[in-house]
């Protein structure tokens, strides 16, 4: 995800300062006192990239994009989980490129403790996250250092490309296409968590999977400028607080908590339970309820009900007088948020593709 505006970088980093604070009451004071520090932090990060890579070359991790810098920001890895493309590039020598290829191919799925804004290699894992999603030049899965080293050597010798930056520097890079069904491979990694949450909260597995695909494309490192974290993109200070309250816990989930795949799937699914059983309770038709839940997961239950009426009870009454097709049409055309309108379409389509997953 290439970003050209410094403001978006600030939006990406601010929430992590917020998420690291367990005391929301003190957040505004802390933020006010540390404005200068925040400016230094965001300014330093963007300045590092601008000075090294030049303007309009800033890459930042997002919901469906893994981005990691290393080698003092001279080398970076980018995985587009939506497009199924891995690009690893360097302004240093090919030895640094080789190392980055190996570390990227063998990175694990545990995002806890990984600072995506710092420079440094992601640790090599004995259970690489990309196994099954990428194959080498012999069509083999890349499961260990030896296989990864050999593939990295092959890529550099046979697939190395170059491009010139606006600042005159030359980038050396390789691109690796993921296999055609990489999304389904990732989805299956999380089926045990999905099935457990489905049983516990009575939420259809296909709905959980459809939301996960739409929110993160099953990227365990997923983050967003809105401070949504992890596979189901749970926002700690809003949905996260509601979830903890439901579980009888105070405060909100931490960044580390939400980067745990099992806990994230549980949190996202429990929020769907809250939407169905509390915030949207009273909607009678199961299909209409599903449409409302999906839209509310993105924009909030209040925003969904206001599409039909400013009075929540009247909104539910109106929904109950409609056919599900009418509810769907109104939510996908009448919701004031274009993102919410598109979200329902995307999740509904994705959910249909998972109804036969076993």
Swiss-Prot record:
InterPro entries: Lysozyme-like_dom_sf, Murein_transglycosylaseC, Murein_transglycosylaseC_N, Transglyc_AS, Transglycosylase_SLT_dom_1. One of its GO terms (molecular function) is hydrolase activity, acting on glycosyl bonds. It is a lipid-anchor. Residues 1-19 form the signal peptide. It is found in: Cell outer membrane. It catalyses: Exolytic cleavage of the (1->4)-beta-glycosidic linkage between N-acetylmuramic acid (MurNAc) and N-acetylglucosamine (GlcNAc) residues in peptidoglycan, from either the reducing or the non-reducing ends of the peptidoglycan chains, with concomitant formation of a 1,6-anhydrobond in the MurNAc residue. Its EC number is 4.2.2.n1. CDD domains: LT_MltC_MltE. Pfam families: Mltc_N (PF11873), SLT (PF01464). It is an enzyme of class 4 (lyase). GO terms for cellular component: cell outer membrane. The keyword Cell wall biogenesis/degradation applies. Keywords: Cell outer membrane, Cell wall biogenesis/degradation, Lipoprotein, Lyase, Membrane, Palmitate, Signal. A lipid is attached at residue 20 (S-diacylglycerol cysteine). Its main location: membrane. A lipid is attached at residue 20 (N-palmitoyl cysteine). GO terms for biological process: cell wall macromolecule catabolic process; cell wall organization; peptidoglycan metabolic process. It comes from the Bacteria. Belongs to the transglycosylase Slt family. Murein-degrading enzyme. May play a role in recycling of muropeptides during cell elongation and/or cell division. This is Membrane-bound lytic murein transglycosylase C. It comes from Actinobacillus succinogenes (strain ATCC 55618 / DSM 22257 / CCUG 43843 / 130Z).
